[in-house]
């Protein structure tokens, strides 16, 4: 259906693509895999008409094509669904889907025909959305489905999806992929760009791997393993993804006893010792993030006690939690962990600004030194610390969030989905950082929906189900099957809760 052959693209002296080829077939989902900077975005922009290749050929349905604009690519049946939907929030679903192409009757928009047409598209996709509803207020997941309906209204047969599940829950992700399977069954070709390798293996029939702007390999998904994909993407073995260092746990740093919040979680008890990484696993909605937020004092609790190094922390008091030595790296770093318009330097010191003041004035030298110290330790890749934090990659943004909390000198660090939305190479760096911090005596609580991450990094794994802590697994006894049995209730709890 689509073939890109030996494509190259440069921007000034920078070679973004060099001799890259890609083939998409009707009825197949094809994963495009590579680290940030591998050239995936440039390739997609060539396919979608944003950029023209300097060399190579693009064939669509057996015809040689040269796109001068996104409109030409769209007319050829190629559509792209971005991670952040680009819809008009104050218009309805139907108006967004048919923007600029609304059916007319006697010179005026025929709203009944518009709603009927869009309703039919949504029904074909199995999407229960009201076409008359305004887009404002829809979840990101629903907005992406509106974008897919819009693509189908253009008779798109090639759908490019750029990190579509990065901001979705597990249930939303499954619903999205049900729609993708429907599209494939109708003969569409889907190009999926994702950092989530488990999604690629579950949903895609073919893979293409890129590294440093070059094609590495292509082939059937069945011919690859996680190890071979990672090696192709980063040139390193998969074992380097989880560089866990051996530690001997020390004294208890965090003690949680009988933590409860009505309707959310109940009677949660566990301890974490210095030097340990304790994983908190479970299905979406099990209450893991809510427990973390309650420990840190963001959310209230009805009962229970939190102690840090023997000191009781009052409920609902984040300042007390910070003073006691707790740090929390939140699940959504862009919305909750960073101020995107501020500099890297200021974001890295937000938690310690009071220490960096001289009277009423900020000691800029001390601020710069503090930010520089921690970002250097975390091997941050940035041009200047005065640049906006929004200019960084996802992995480097996560390092800034870590720097912000490490600057407080915590005894306990809670990290919620620490590698969500970052590429494989950045994952390895975040994992190495957590392992080094634990080896230095920090107590780490790691909440993650990425089971290989939990299994690879945790000394112990606590599993939650429906707001309750249902079991504990040692590193030696843990497996994906054992965790999922506990998380789903398919088997009696294994192990004991501390």
Swiss-Prot record:
Biological role: Part of the ABC transporter complex RbsABC involved in ribose import. Responsible for energy coupling to the transport system.
Catalytic activity: D-ribose(out) + ATP + H2O = D-ribose(in) + ADP + phosphate + H(+)
SUPFAM superfamilies: P-loop containing nucleoside triphosphate hydrolases
Family: Belongs to the ABC transporter superfamily. Ribose importer (TC 3.A.1.2.1) family.
Gene Ontology terms, MF aspect: ABC-type D-ribose transporter activity; ATP binding; ATP hydrolysis activity
Subunit structure: The complex is composed of an ATP-binding protein (RbsA), two transmembrane proteins (RbsC) and a solute-binding protein (RbsB).
Cellular component annotations (GO), alphabetically ordered: plasma membrane
Membrane topology (UniProt): Peripheral membrane protein
Keyword Transport in annotation: yes
Pfam families per the UniProt record, alphabetical: ABC_tran (PF00005)
Lineage: Bacteria, Thermotogati, Deinococcota, Deinococci, Deinococcales
Protein's cellular compartments: Cell membrane
Keywords for this protein: ATP-binding, Cell membrane, Membrane, Nucleotide-binding, Plasmid, Repeat, Sugar transport, Translocase, Transport
ABC transporter domain residues: 2-237, 247-491
EC identifiers of the protein: 7.5.2.7
Full protein name: Ribose import ATP-binding protein RbsA
Entry-linked InterPro entries: AAA+_ATPase, ABC_carbohydrate_import_ATPase, ABC_transporter-like_ATP-bd, ABC_transporter-like_CS, P-loop_NTPase
CDD domains: ABC_Carb_Monos_I (cd03216), ABC_Carb_Monos_II (cd03215)
